[in-house]
C-alpha cells in the first residue's frame, strides 16, 4: 500500500509537471494563432515565449488578484492544467483502471441517477439519498482529478471540511466531502464534447466502449469496496437517455419536477446571478464549462430537444424564455414515462415530506433508505412576484405539469 501511495504521488506530480511544461507552448499558440502542429521550433519568438511563459507560471500566482475566494491561484492553475487537458485526464483514467482493476466487476450494472431540469431540487434529493449510507458518489475533494480519483486520493487528504454556502445563494451548504455533479466531465472527455455545439446541448449516442468505461468509472469511485451503489446527479442525462437505456434497461433514474412558473423564475434569477459572477470571475466561468454546467450564466446552452424552438422569441432575461425551456424538457419526459425504471418525483413532496419520500424511493429501489436523524421539511422559496407571462405558455406548461403528477411516486 505504501509503494502504491508513493507511485500514485509520482504519477500525479508527473501529470502536473507535464501540464506546467506545455503551458508556455499553449500560450505561444494563443498569441500567434498558430496550431500546435505547425509550430516553428527554429523561431526566436518560439524560444522567447517558452522562457517568458515559464517565468510567468512561477510569478503569476504572486501578482494576480484572486477573485475566486474558494481557490488559490495555485489551485486554479492545477484545475486548468488537468481539466482543460483531456489527454492527461484520459491517460490517468487508463492508468487508474490498471492499478485498481480489482474494483471492476464484469457483472456490474446497478446504479442510480438523479436528474431533472436545473432548479428542480436535484441537489437536495441527491444529498438526501446519500445520507442513507447506501451509496457512493463523487465529491468536491475529487477535484480536479475527476477521472483518477484513487490516484488523487493517495496524494490529497483535506483535513478541514468547513461548510459554506454555494454560489447559488440558496442556503445549500457544501464542503470538501459534499457530493457534487462531477461525472459529466467523463462524458465530455470520452465524447470530445461532440454533443456541445455553439448554441445548444444535443442528444447523442454512447458507443459500447464508452459505456463499458463508464461502468468501470462508477466502480472505481467506490473507495471502500463495499456493496454501496453508485449515485450521481446529472442534469444532462436526458441527452443520452435513450442510448444508455439500450445498453442497460435496469439502472434507475429518479427525475424530479417542479411547478413550472416557480422553476422558471428560479432559473431566471440564477441566470442573472451567474451572469454577474461570470463577468467578474473568469475562473468561475471556466469551471462551469469544464464540468459541463450550461444551465445558466454567460455560458448558458439550452437542451436541443424540440424541433419547434419557441425560446428564440424571447430574451434570456424574460420569464417566458425559461418557461419555454421547461415545456421543451418536460414534454420530452412525457415520451419516456413507459420506462418502468424511470421514477418521477415532485419537488413539493421532497420539500414537505422528505422522510416519507425517502422511504418510498427505497421501496422502488429495493433498499432500506433512511437517515440517521429524521429530516425537517425543506423551506420553499418565497412567493412569486407579478410577471408578464405568456398565457399560452402558462396553459401549456400547467397541462404538462398535471400530466407528470399522474405518474409521480405517491407518498
Task: Indicate residue ranges for each PLM-predicted region.
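PAPS-dependent sulfation machinery
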Residues: 141-231, 300-302
